[in-house]
Amino acid sequence: MHIAIVTAGGAGMFCGSCIHDNTWARALRDAGVEVSLIPLYTPIRVDEADQTSSPVFFGGINTFLEDRFSWWGRVPRFLTRWLDSPSIIRMVTQRAISTDARELGAMTVSMIEGEHGPHRRAGEELAQYITHLKPDIVCFSNALLCGTLRTLKQTYFGPVHCVLQGDDIFLDGLVEPYRSRAMAMLSQRAADFDGFMTHSHYYRDYMAAYLKLPVEKFRQLPLALDCAPHDGQPRDVCGDPPTIGYFARICPEKGLDRLVKAVLLVRERIPNVRLRAGGYLAAQHRSYLDDVTHAAAPLGDAFEYIGSPAEKQEKIEFLKSLDVFSVPTVYREPKGIYVLEAWSNGIPVVLPSHGAFPQLIESTGGGLLVAPESPEDLADALEKVLTDEVLRKNLAQLGHEGIRSKHNLQNLARATLALFDSTGTGPGTIMS
C-alpha cells in the first residue's frame, strides 16, 4: 500500500500538525507501508527525523509573488523554480513570511480558487507529481488545500481524504470580506474530498456542521507520540519548589494569561509555587507576552519563559522539571499533542473541559478537567494536584502508562489501515 500525505509547512516554526503528520508517516513506514510525505509552502520543521523526501510544492515565496503580481505566473518556470529551494525558503521565513490569518485573507481566497486563481500552475505541478507517484490513497493535512483537488482528480482516480486539525481557527481569524468568501468556496470544494479524519469526536461533529458536510464522511484518527526519547518518570514526591508548567505556542488563544491568573491564586496558598512556560513566540504576539510578563510580575523570579527549545531533548528536560502541566486554551483544542508530551514524561495535566481534552483525559485518566474561563477552578485543581501526593502520582502514572498503551505509533498505524479498509479504500481496491 502506498499513501501520499500532503502537509503544509509551518513557516519555520514547530507546528503541531506538521509534527503529527511527520509522526504519522513514520508510524506507517514502520508498519511496512510506503509513504510519500509531501511538503507545501515551506519545509516542515520537526524535532525528530524529517520524513519528507519530495520537493516543496506551492513554495511560499512564489505563492506570495503570484498573489501580489498577476504576471508572475507567466514567468517561465525555470526562472522561478530556484525560489522553491528549501534553503532559500528557510532563509526568507526567518524574517518575512507571516502565518497570521489577519494578514493572509486575500492569499487564502486565491489558494481555494484553485484552477480559477493565480496558483493554477502550482496546482498542476502538485497534481502531476502525485499522479506520477501512483499512490493508493492521498491525504491532505487540511481543508484549505482543497483548491488543488479538482485539478488532481482529472489525472488521479484514487480516493483523496482530508485530515482536519484546526482549520476553523485559521478561517475564523480571517478579516472580512475574505472570511465569508473563503467559507463559501470551502464549503463547496470540501465536498470533493472522499472522506475526512479528525483526532477527536468533538472536532468531527464541529467540523461536519462548520463545513456543512454529512458526519458519515468523518472518521477518527488517534493522536500518537513516539515515547522512546521521553524518559521522564512519575515522581514519588512533589518538587521543591512545586512547579506548574506550560508548553505551547505563546498566543492569546492558548491561554497563558489565564494560567498566570490561576497561579497567582495558587501562590496565596502555596507561597513558593513557580510557573515555567515555553513555546514558539511569533512576532505578532510579542506584545501579548509582554502583557503576560507584566501580569506575572508579582511572581518575581518564580515566573520563567524559556523560549522555544531548538532541540527535543531541551523540551524533554523542561517537561521533566514540572510537577503539573496546563494549557488552559480559550478556543476548543482539536488535538492537544502537548498533552501527550506531558504524559510521556510522567506529568499530570489540568485542562479546561472543552474541545478534545475530555476525550483525551478519558483515554488515560491522566489529569483533571476544570470549568473553562474560570481561574478559580483552575487554581483549585492545580493546588489539589500539588498538595495531594497520592492523587498527583496516580494521575501521573495513569498518563504515563496510558500514552504508551493507547497513543503509540503502532496503534496509529493500525487505526489508519483499519480506517481505510472500513471505507473501502484499502490496498488493491482502487486504481490510479
Question: What would you call each of these model-derived segments?
Answer:
Residues 289-313:
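Nucleotide-activated donor-binding/catalytic signature segment of Leloir-type glycosyltransferases, i.e.
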Residues 202, 224:
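Carbohydrate-associated surface elements
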Residues 236-254, 260-263, 276:
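Conserved donor-binding/catalytic core segment of Leloir-type glycosyltransferases
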Residues 274-290, 305-308:
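Glycosyltransferase donor-sugar binding loop
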Residues 348-351:
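Short hydrophobic beta-strand element within catalytic cores of glycosyltransferases
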Residues 37-125:
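A conserved catalytic-core segment of Leloir-type glycosyltransferases
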Residues 363, 368-375, 384-390:
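Conserved acidic donor-binding segment of nucleotide-sugar-dependent glycosyltransferases
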Residues 377, 384, 391-405, 412-418:
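A short, well-ordered alpha-helix in the C-terminal region of glycosyltransferases
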